[in-house]
Amino acid sequence: LIIGGAVSGSTAVKKLTDEGIRCVVVEQNKMPYGKIEDGLPRWHEKQRINEYFKIDDIISHELVDFVPLTRIGKDVSFEEIYNMGWSCIYFANGAWKDRSFPIKEIEDFNNFYYQNPFVYWFNHYHEPSYNGPKVDIKDDAIVIGGGLASIDVCKITQLELVRQKVESKIENFDIIEMEHKGIPKYLEQYDMKYEDLGINGTTLVYRRNIENMPLTTIPEDATPEMVEKRKLARRKILNNTLDKFLFKVAECTQPVGLSYDCLLYTSDAADDGLC
């Protein structure tokens, strides 16, 4: 039995069916796409479709029984599942729910959002029938994280800040085209400059240094030379992204508490906290 049919679940299914082992996949949603469906911003359309095809191909195998719209603990208890006598129960329920922020008071903070509902909003707010969570993008936002998902959130906030300034001035404004070209090049074709828009911009707050951002993988058996190259590649990847989307990065910094209407930080790169 495999609980969850997206990336992790379908990978397990592939390995098992390759060995001739029958699988039952239980999925809480209608389709087994997990965060691929709405965890990726809408400009990742080609990647999303490719992943859909991969998962569909695996789940449609003759040795697979797919059970959608079934939640463990709600539609069927874990005790019931345990007593069914499965040879193996594999949990692949993924990151459908954001990990709670360690400073509990932050949830009372105006305009505080977790990544999952934030990206869901971005993917759907333009649809006429949209009735989901509302997000109010403000200037001087901070994004706390350091992986690819947090960079996507920084890109969204920057793109939305620019959209607020120029959408009424550009016929057929296209936020996806702006993502593909980058903010400076997109504005340039309309004789506009980011510096003239009066935007302070988004800041990405990361607790480690840029070389440790998980933007490229480093194999466990990597040589010291390869490790150094991969770390340099991480900084290069981030710098290229900064050039295109113009957000800022505060490395070796993490929030430690709240003070009235702002976050307090500690930074290894400075003697004092900042607010």
Features from the language model and the residues they span:
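N-terminal Rossmann-like FAD-binding beta1-loop-alpha1 element of flavoenzymes
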Residues: 1-19, 154
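Glycine-rich FAD pyrophosphate-binding loop
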Residues: 21-32
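Conserved N-terminal glycine-rich FAD pyrophosphate-binding loop of Rossmann-like flavoproteins
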Residues: 30-50
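A Rossmann-like FAD-binding core segment of flavoenzymes
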Residues: 52-68, 163-267
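Feature captures the FAD/FMN-dependent oxidoreductase FAD-binding
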Residues: 56-103, 256-264
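Glycine-rich dinucleotide-binding loop and its adjacent helix/turn
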Residues: 98-190
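Single conserved hydrophobic/aromatic residue that forms the stacking wall/gate
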Residues: 265-275
